[in-house]
């Protein structure tokens, strides 16, 4: 498993903080945004990260010397200053278990705990599309979130799914919204407020300033407006879900 760590992100929406990219092999097949051609492939997929410069960078991770092995990446995270804000995975997901071919949607618990331990005392956050119907996946995410230093958000693709994942009680939740969704007043079917990503709605806002996705015990769902090359197609799919 290879990971690339950029110490100062050049993405204005993220801000000048460390950001990582994990090779596409980490993405679970349960991710509904994945291309039929596989993770990291732009053809027919809806994942914003598969397109443009980020997509080109992502597809090179683990090739031609780009990125480092997981253990070296974790050592680099451990060396970050105390309270350092950082984003894990502008593309990619949690490390995947390869103990059995049937386990392709099961996270690698050992590697996940290695990361959460390395991030102790930091202010990291990430997102996962792994299937939370798996008891192991739920247990790993819950334990990762018990460690002070890395917040794992569960990614949902409808407001009703956001409710379901929030009710698990193991992690904060984010949801993908159609690109033309209102910026205020959205609630889930169970009444949870949805805060549309401030970096998408405010010109002077970035992840480095907002930090909302890093808050573990928040009551709100963070909503991300569909964006990127496939946003129109993805928005059409999302509009029919709730």
Give residue spans per PLM region.
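Class I S-adenosyl-L-methionine
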Residues: 1-242
């Amino acid at each position: 498993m290879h990971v690339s760590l950029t110490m100062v992100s050049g993405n204005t929406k993220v801000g000048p903080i460390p950001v990582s990219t994990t090779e596409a092999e980490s993405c679970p097949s349960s991710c509904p945004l994945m291309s039929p051609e596989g993770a990291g492939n732009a053809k027919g997929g809806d994942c914003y990260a598969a397109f443009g410069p980020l997509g080109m960078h992502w597809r090179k991770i683990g090739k031609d010397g780009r990125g480092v092995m997981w253990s070296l990446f974790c050592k680099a995270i451990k060396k970050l200053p105390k309270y350092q804000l950082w984003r894990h995975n502008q593309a990619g997901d949690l490390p995947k278990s390869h103990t059995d071919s049937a386990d392709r949607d099961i996270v690698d618990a050992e590697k996940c705990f290695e990361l959460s331990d390395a991030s102790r005392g930091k202010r990291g956050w990430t997102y996962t599309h792994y299937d939370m119907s798996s008891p192991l996946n739920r247990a790993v995410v819950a334990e990762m979130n018990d460690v002070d230093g890395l917040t794992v958000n569960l990614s949902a693709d409808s407001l009703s799914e956001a409710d379901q994942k929030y009710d698990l009680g193991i992690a904060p939740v984010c949801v993908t919204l159609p690109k033309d969704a209102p910026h205020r007043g959205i609630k889930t079917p169970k009444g949870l407020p949805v805060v549309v990503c401030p970096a998408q709605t405010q010109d002077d806002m970035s992840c480095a300033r907002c930090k909302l996705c890093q808050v573990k015990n928040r009551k709100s769902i963070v909503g991300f407006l569909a964006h990127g090359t496939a946003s129109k197609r993805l928005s059409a799919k999302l509009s029919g879900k709730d």
